[in-house]
Amino acid sequence: MLTRKQIQLLEFIQARMARDGVPPSFDEMKLALDLRSKSGIHRLVTALEERGFIRRLPHRARALEIVRLPESLSKGPGFQPRVIEGTMPDRPAPLPRGAMEVSVSAIELPVMGRIAAGVPIEAISEISHHIAVPTTMLSGQDRHYALEVRGDSMIEAGINDGDVVVIREQNAAESGDIVVALVDGYEATLKRYRRKGNMIALEAANPAYETRVLPEDKVRIQGRLVGLIRSY
């Protein structure tokens, strides 16, 4: 059985997706439900996800899919979940006019948005463009995507502001891996991953930034760094 706030949030998400085709942000949810902080929204979203009413989609910090509705909200039989656009496509977009075809030794990957190498930000968003990546960076049939780096917290690992990182999609990591981590369900960051018992440490590669140590249920791995592209 859902609480009143859970029903209100589900109703708000459904209405916004029906109107705009995309779910509301955590800030918009907070204002709509008159809550003081986004942590309250995070708890409500997690509860709805655990009960099977919504599902969070990978690589999009705001990506929510309505799986089912309670009887009090259902419009009748035949309800179909509405998925927001902008998830990773099966095929790259057509080449723009005047562009040259990429050689067989490279493949085009979608650039899914920006990732913070600094203070975590609500970062991963819709596909902005595609980028040619050498096939030697990629691992077999695994799914990959790219992100633009913003910030300088990983400079001692050779990752600079403005670089494009190539990420292999995976939901687990080994200590020492540089990963895309989603913190509290809405903040995305690029950091070195360390497990310490039931805690996760997200380490910067810049002494100006502190290591963040969080409970494991607050951190969701979105992928592992496998390559980097830099423009001069």
UniProtKB/Swiss-Prot annotation:
It catalyses: Hydrolysis of Ala-|-Gly bond in repressor LexA. The keyword Transcription regulation applies. GO terms for cellular component: protein-DNA complex. InterPro entries: LexA, LexA-like, LexA/Signal_pep-like_sf, LexA_DNA-bd_dom, LexA_repressor, Peptidase_S24_LexA, Peptidase_S24_S26A/B/C, WH-like_DNA-bd_sf. One of its GO terms (biological process) is proteolysis. It holds the Pfam family LexA_DNA_bind. Keywords: Autocatalytic cleavage, DNA damage, DNA repair, DNA replication, DNA-binding, Hydrolase, Repressor, SOS response, Transcription, Transcription regulation. It comes from the Bacteria. SUPFAM superfamilies: LexA/Signal peptidase, Winged helix' DNA-binding domain. The active site is at 153 (for autocatalytic cleavage activity), 191 (for autocatalytic cleavage activity). PANTHER family: LEXA REPRESSOR (PTHR33516), LEXA REPRESSOR-RELATED (PTHR33516:SF2). Belongs to the peptidase S24 family. Homodimer. Represses a number of genes involved in the response to DNA damage (SOS response), including recA and lexA. In the presence of single-stranded DNA, RecA interacts with LexA causing an autocatalytic cleavage which disrupts the DNA-binding part of LexA, leading to derepression of the SOS regulon and eventually DNA repair. This is LexA repressor. It comes from Paracoccus denitrificans (strain Pd 1222). The lineage of its organism: Bacteria, Pseudomonadati, Pseudomonadota, Alphaproteobacteria, Rhodobacterales.
